[in-house]
């Protein structure tokens, strides 16, 4: 989960047979229905932007622990700094020991920042991976320290189901740039999962878009909306924290409130210190969108907004989750709401 984020993917290595056997094919459909799985940021006739793997984990458990630890060490440093003995000789053992004890917490807080927090704060809110079906290119937005912007042809990337380095039960979509059997670069996209099916569903969405067009990714008119919101708002941070803690019932939410509250605040602080990702002008020039593009899907202000506000959409989503097909001739006023939102 943290490879490619806290530590870089290994490059210059030999591509393994296990990775090759887990290939996600571009030309043929797989046994999975296309699904966003909260991975789609935006879509139109020219490109889709997909979320990076780390997004849902930003500001959560590890970051909260490290941040609270850093603040605790700073507080301890200030407390000890005001407690240095005034009457001890400057180079006495007592003074040196007191100085060492005082500086240690400050050094520890700096270590926590260098180890983890610098990867969270003062970076970017998210790191989109853009798939342009007209230029047949992929644009991977990355920090300069991680190699900077990667632009690579769609047909030159080997995609497969990646596995976690430490948490081997986790899967994700992994893109490999190969030179023969040697890995030259690697990137991951979409949220990780504990099963292959969610990963395959995200891949089928991307594959259909690039190979068949935007009309192929939605099997029903009521599927044509974006589920995810990347806006760094309190509400989105709270929704993400509830999802991260798996607080699916009111009882769980009350029980886990200290964690939910902490994660919400820390995630909000992380995002407020970060800036929005902006692709270079030359990339945007290749990704022009027509003003009246019929395949621009509406984007919610908060995660899951449309399901809770559009009449009938919750029932449709529940039927879909149960595998129940819904006829495409839905009431006109219900289907048209997405069409109207897309023009706003």
Model-found features: residue ranges?
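Membrane-cytosol interface motif
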Residues: 128-143
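Alpha-helical transmembrane spans
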Residues: 49-125, 233-344
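A membrane-cytosol interface segment of integral membrane proteins
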Residues: 158, 166-227
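Short, non-transmembrane cytosolic segments of multipass membrane proteins
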Residues: 1-39
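Juxtamembrane amphipathic/hinge helix adjacent to a transmembrane helix
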Residues: 41-45, 213-245
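Phosphoinositide-dependent membrane-docking surfaces
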Residues: 137-138, 147-166
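Short, mixed charged/polar active-site loops
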Residues: 128, 146-152, 182-186
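Short, hydrophobic/proline-enriched secondary-structure or compact coil segments at domain edges
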Residues: 36-57, 173
């Amino acid at each position: 989960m943290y490879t490619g984020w806290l530590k870089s993917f290994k490059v210059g290595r030999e591509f393994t047979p296990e990775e090759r056997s887990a290939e996600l094919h571009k030309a043929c459909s797989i046994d999975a229905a296309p699904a966003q799985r909260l991975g789609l940021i935006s879509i139109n006739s020219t490109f889709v932007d997909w979320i990076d793997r780390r997004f849902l984990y930003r500001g959560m458990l590890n970051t909260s622990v490290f941040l609270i630890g850093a603040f605790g060490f700073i507080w301890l440093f200030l407390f000890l700094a005001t407690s240095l003995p005034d009457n001890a000789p400057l180079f006495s053992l007592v003074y040196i020991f007191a100085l060492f004890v005082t500086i240690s917490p400050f050094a520890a807080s700096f270590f926590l920042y260098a180890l983890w927090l610098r990867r969270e704060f003062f970076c970017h809110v998210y790191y989109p991976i853009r798939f342009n079906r007209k230029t047949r290119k992929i644009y991977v937005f990355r920090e300069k320290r991680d190699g900077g912007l990667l632009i690579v042809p769609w047909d030159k990337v080997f995609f497969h189901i990646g596995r976690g380095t430490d948490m081997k039960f986790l899967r994700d979509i992994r893109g490999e740039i190969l030179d023969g059997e040697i890995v030259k670069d690697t990137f991951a996209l979409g949220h990780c999962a504990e099963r292959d099916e969610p990963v395959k569903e995200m891949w089928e969405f991307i594959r259909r878009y690039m190979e068949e067009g935007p009309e192929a990714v939605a099997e029903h008119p009521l599927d044509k909306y974006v589920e995810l919101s990347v806006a760094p708002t309190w509400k989105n941070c709270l929704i993400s924290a509830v999802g991260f803690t798996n607080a699916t019932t009111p009882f769980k939410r009350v029980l886990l409130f200290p964690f939910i509250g902490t994660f919400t605040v820390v995630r909000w602080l992380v995002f407020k210190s970060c800036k929005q990702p902006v692709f270079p002008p030359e990339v945007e020039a290749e990704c022009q969108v027509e003003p009246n593009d019929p395949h621009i899907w509406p984007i919610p202000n908060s995660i899951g907004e449309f399901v809770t506000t559009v009449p009938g959409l919750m029932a449709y989503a529940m039927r879909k989750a149960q595998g129940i097909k819904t006829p495409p001739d839905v009431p006109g006023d219900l289907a048209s709401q997405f069409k109207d939102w897309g023009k706003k």
